[in-house]
Every structure is written in C-alpha cells, then in structure tokens.
Amino acid sequence: MLDDATYTPRLKTLYKDTIRGALKEEFGYKNEMQIPKLDKIVLNIGCGRAAVKDSKKAKSAQEDLTKIAGQKALTTVAKNSIAGFRVREGMPMGAKVTLRGERMYEFLDRLITIAMPRIRDFRGVSGTSFDGRGNYALGLKEHIVFPEIDFDKIDEAWGMDIVIATTANTDAEAKALLKAFNMPFNS
C-alpha cells in the first residue's frame, strides 16, 4: 500500500521525468521556466431548463461533479433575471469546480485513460479547440462516462465542459504538451 505522503500522480511523474525534457528540446527553450505546464482544469455542468423547472437538478449536478472531481463543487447561480426564460437572479443553474495540483493530474489521467474510451463512437478530440493563448476546451455530451457515477442512480445525464489551462504561450506548445500526456487528438 502506498503512503499518501510519498504518492505522486502518474502524469505528474511523467511530466517531470520525460515531457519537460522533450518540450525543451522540441521548442528550444533556454530557461526551465519557459517550459509549458498544466496550470488548472475547470469542470462545469450547466443544467439549463432543467434547473428552471426543478432547483434540485442543480444540486444533483453539484453532487455528481463533486464525485467526478474528488473536490467539492460550487453551485453556479444566474447573474441576472431573464423573464422570457423564467430565470430569476440568484437561481441555481449548475455547478463548477477548479482543480489544481495533484487532483488536476489525477483527473486528467482518469479523463484520458478511463472516461474517453467509454464515450460512444469516440474518434478523438478536436485538435482545434485552443483559444490562442495555450488553453484547451472540450465538451462531453454525458457525464456518465466517468466510473464514479453510478448509471442506475442518476436522474439525468448532463453535458460537461472541461477547460485545461496551461502556461503555454501558443496553441502549438499547448498541443504538444497535451499530446505528450496522450490526449487523443483526431487531427
């Protein structure tokens, strides 16, 4: 059994031992601090119309996101009222969580090795979903691809946004970093 004090996530070890050197060689960085690294991963579930009809749906989404992330999720609320959608200011609309450090590496490992292969008709993620500043965004149609979610106990399958923020300056650097972590790009 591993001691919690000595445990290091697999992808963090891979980054320190292999990826840093490969990126430094590929892009010709002169300083160690120039080498891109993962900064944070933000997970978001928006309930939309379901939350308007039943406020318990946002609570359910928050609980599911907490299970997936291994960290308590925040409930997101409507910033302003929109009468046409029957939305009131302060109404719970979904959940979000920001992962950093070891939990971030653990989540990325589970996403790439366990969750993505469980997606129906999966052919890789888009290689063009970068924002121009080295951050990558992807969406999942169903959050039930994560093994933490018991399919029989959920009332609704939610879509999910995942944003991977890196310290890379360009999209090419960020893509090389994520490819080194075995992110399955289709292009």
UniProtKB/Swiss-Prot annotation:
Listed GO biological process terms: translation
SUPFAM superfamilies the UniProt entry points to: RL5-like
Role summary: This is one of the proteins that bind and probably mediate the attachment of the 5S RNA into the large ribosomal subunit, where it forms part of the central protuberance. In the 70S ribosome it contacts protein S13 of the 30S subunit (bridge B1b), connecting the 2 subunits; this bridge is implicated in subunit movement. Contacts the P site tRNA; the 5S rRNA and some of its associated proteins might help stabilize positioning of ribosome-bound tRNAs.
Family matches, as Gene3D superfamilies: 3.30.1440.10
Keyword Transit peptide tagged: no
GO MF: rRNA binding; structural constituent of ribosome; tRNA binding
Organism in which the protein naturally occurs: Ruegeria sp. (strain TM1040) (Silicibacter sp.)
Protein name (Swiss-Prot/TrEMBL): Large ribosomal subunit protein uL5
HAMAP family, alphabetized: Ribosomal_uL5_B
Coiled coil: none
